[in-house]
Amino acid sequence: MPLPLPNLDDRRWEDLVEEGRALIPLYGPDWTDHNLHDPGITIMELLAWVTEMDIYWLNRVPDAHRRKFLAMAGVTPRPPQPAWTVLHLRLKAGATAQHLPAGVHFEAARSEAASPSTVPFRTLAPLAAIPGEVQTLQLKQGDRFTDLTARLLRGEALALWGDDPQPGAELYIGLSDPPPVETPVTLYAVLEGEHATWAARARLIEEAARRAGLCRPQFGCADEPGEEPPVDVPLPPHHSVALSWEYLSAGGRWHPLAVTDDTRAFTLSGSIVLTLPAAPGMSRAVIGAAPEPAYYLRCRLRRGSYDAAPVLRHLLLNGVAAEQAAAAGVTIWLIAPGANLPADPPQPGTDDTLNFSLDASGAIADLRREPNAPALRVLAFEPPDGGPGRLALAVETLGEGDGRPHQQIAGAWPQVAGESLRVFTREGDAWRVWEQRPDFDAAGRADAHFVLDARTGEITFGDGERGRTVPPGVPILAAYDSTLASGGALKPNRVFHLPDSPTNRALLAEVAAIAASLEIVTNPVPASGGAEAETVDQAAGRALAELQKPTRAVTAADYEALAFETPGVTLARVGVRPNLHPGFPCWDAPGVVTVIILPHLPAGRPEPSCETIRQVAAYLARRRIVGTRIEVVGPTYRTVAVQASVRACQGERPAALRERLIARLDAFFDPLIGGPEGGGWPFGRDVYRSEVLQLLDETPGVEHVISLELLGDDCEPGCGNVCIGPVELVD
């Protein structure tokens, strides 16, 4: 609960006037006329009005101070966030494979009249678009094939490996056209659930980076610690499940495939990139329940167990993730004939550290590479050939410096995506790189700092005392990604096209030819996630929510919440037992906390794998209190049988009633949906005869219960309750 803000001064205008009038005899005894018509009283009332305004501001906290308070809590207002979607490219029949690097722009027209008229998206990964599509999708469990093609084409959510995945299950993916050899084939899987999102992926990588940072060797002298470089770690594989990918060749033989799986064994939305060898080639065949022949890929669930069954929404050939952002601005410099050029010319579509000197006409007279120059995207480079050449960089010219304190300038696009803004000035023949800071409080006279207003896109430079000013006449340039933020949201199945933009011309050799080979480009999933720049009030609300989340395991509720938050693990229930060791349940164990975890699988009797237990234990170990021992275990199941005789209502069939009673008992004792409150049978809760008796008696079709006995592990029937251990569930 937030503390109430105190009223530092509750005096009003009338109080101030009366206080001043009461002090007149003390400071001005000769002043005897205190009526309203006196000019002195009029001046006093005016000053009281000014003082009341000062008191009003005294009780208010300005946004600048609130930002400082939020920064002390580790929270800063978020910049504009771009929307995100998946693009599905389909090539025309007979087209050849098209290689698209990351960063290619696609545009969708707005359905409503708005500015701008198109919404640009850029791809986040390279893609080799090939002809064909996913023709069939089949699941093989044992000797039985299940055709999932119709549900996949309708966009329905389907359990990819069934409701209870088991090792040995096989997925058969039939392609309509043979993929080219030695060419990356991309399948994009869109999965459902909060544990399959980009946020879940980011948490996985963040936790892996933290663990890698703990294990890094320390280099350098002890008296010169310096700043360690950030840890760059890839997406960790699934902690339990291992998949094998194969393709079918002539003669019905299956051959292994080289695979880069970015879905973490179908637990995250992402791409699966497969590369076919030159030999043997793929063969077309009819397999399983699908009547049409296809070129088949096979994915086998080789070992391990899932915490929850993966739910697939889309499986796209030539699918690629895209975000609603685009590089803003292009600046072109002419290259004078006879200019000095590097032996290795700049390549369009790459980032290069270029510097140059200009002649009197403003054309480049000397182009060179310098390691300290900023890395900028080269959009075009044309050396002089009988006339001036041309160099185009993905940087926007904002204007020129005027030398004044707190100069403000803005780009053509007010919404800057994320933390992409970089600001430079050209001072003589050198680049000066400016650093973005939240304010100028720590800036000195020589510090090249600037402040960005994320809501308006305005850039503010220093005043000469705190932060440098921009010298007069110096060009100011900026490289950044623009976004429409929440305006980039699109409904699914919108049609995109490949524009002839400067970025695409730099990345693609033949933009028109590639655009002509595309039959259609759509987004099967809606573009979502875009957000405007966060206000101070919104950041304060987020700070309150984040501060309420546990970051250290102190109470039982903290252990439970942190166990649920373990990256890469999907749990259905968590139980916490302080002062209990699972190996000695009848004894108090001070300092020991037992955490019982329960995934969603296997169906009917879920229990975690050893790998899942290790993941949760490692996550909790870094957040425990010193001196606390954590034991992470799965539940132990105790078999409880019910022997009962009931009298059926008139006209009720005994066999149907028996099945109904068994179903109700199974649901009541179910570890996920059972128990008195329907949230799963509580850990360590005894089975009470009275509750079972009530359950049987309330079953439709039962007139009354004649007899009831409960049987425990000893198989001896009894008329009392059945005791359950602290880490046990009912089977």
At which residue positions do the language-model features occur?
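Signature of Asx- and small-polar-rich beta-strand/turn repeats characteristic
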Residues: 1-731
